[in-house]
Amino acid sequence: MCIGKIPRKAASPSPEPTRPGSTCFSASRLNGTTFQIVEDDKFLEMPIIYAKVYPSVFVLIDTGCGGAARDSSVELRSLRRFLETFPVKDNGEAPLNPGGEREYLVICTHCHYDHIMPGGIEQFVETEGSTVWASNYDKDYLSPTRLPSTSLCDKLNIKTPEYTITNWCRDGQQVVDNAGHGLGLTVYHTPGHTPDEVAIWDSCERVLFVGDSMYQYAPIFFFETQSVIRYSESVGKMRQLVRRFNAETDAADFLAEVDTFLYQIVTGQVKRKASSDMSGHPRDSYTRKDGGLEFQGNGEYFEEFKASKEAMDSIRKRQIVEQTTLGATDCSVVLPR
């Protein structure tokens, strides 16, 4: 999630006639069991939702902007209806979950609005047998009293979704269906972008879903309540996981790129640029020369990092290890953009 980072036309100011058969969602096959669904939304977030099809359950990693379409003329704006009725070319022209034949299991990578908006997640929690999984790292962060703020819904003046988390995930928890059968998915706490951020390791397809922890060619944001120190720790953690999983070059290399760029920032090798957030509050911006990586956040977060001997020693040590270690590989990281 990153507000306004996709330069596209704004939503149409007036309603247009509905175009039959049109939708704001598009789906393509990522691998043997996983589909990537992109939502063309009016907030210009273009959230990516991942759908994994199992014999016993239909897993969704995030639920997007709830059909808040950029194009007001599209007919189908319900994610659930799209999954249950819309023919997908990469699925033999069949819907991904025809008629809702499989129960839904939703994993929230974090609680920002473009991952949980009312028209999305609420469609699934109202169904008997559906479950919602989220991080137990900081339960209060996801409480109904704080969610309007932590989700950023209040900043955009949009309704905060109402849903119950049925499964609070501890770090390293295995995801199971309602019968207790393992799905080959493991949830890891990766706080930093938000306290509740998680990554999901798919051991069958050898893919690591990183949520909004990192992007290519789009800013990585640090808003209020977020921490560059915790983020750095999570990047280091994911690098260790990738090595343990005998991860593929694209996964290991990109994580190393993010880690190295952050190191260059906190050691003064990258020039700071002044910018502002959507409320007009000042923030610092750091962009790699090729534009492939960018960090934005309150300058205090970066200064806090520089002042922490433990944080600086840890990231410096990882750079030394990177210079002396090469890993064999056979898996990949899935990025949200």
Residue ranges of model-derived segments:
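Short acidic-hydrophobic surface loop/beta-edge motif
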Residues: S26-L30, K52, D171-G180, Y286
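Short Pro/Gly-enriched beta-strand edge/turn motifs at strand-loop
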Residues: R8-K9, L30-Q36, L152-I158, G180-L185
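Active-site HxH/HxHxD metal-binding segment of metal-dependent hydrolases
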Residues: G67-H181
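Short, basic/low-complexity N-terminal boundary segments at the transition from targeting/disordered tails
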Residues: M1-P17, S26-R29, V106, C153
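Accessory terminal helices/loops
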Residues: C2-A11, E16, Q240-R337
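Short Gly/Pro-enriched turn/cap motifs at secondary-structure boundaries
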Residues: F25, E39-D41, T160, T164-T166, ...
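Conserved beta-strand hairpin/beta-sheet module of binuclear metal-dependent hydrolase folds
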Residues: P20-P95, I200-D212
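Metallo-beta-lactamase
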Residues: F58-L60, C65-E75, G180-S279
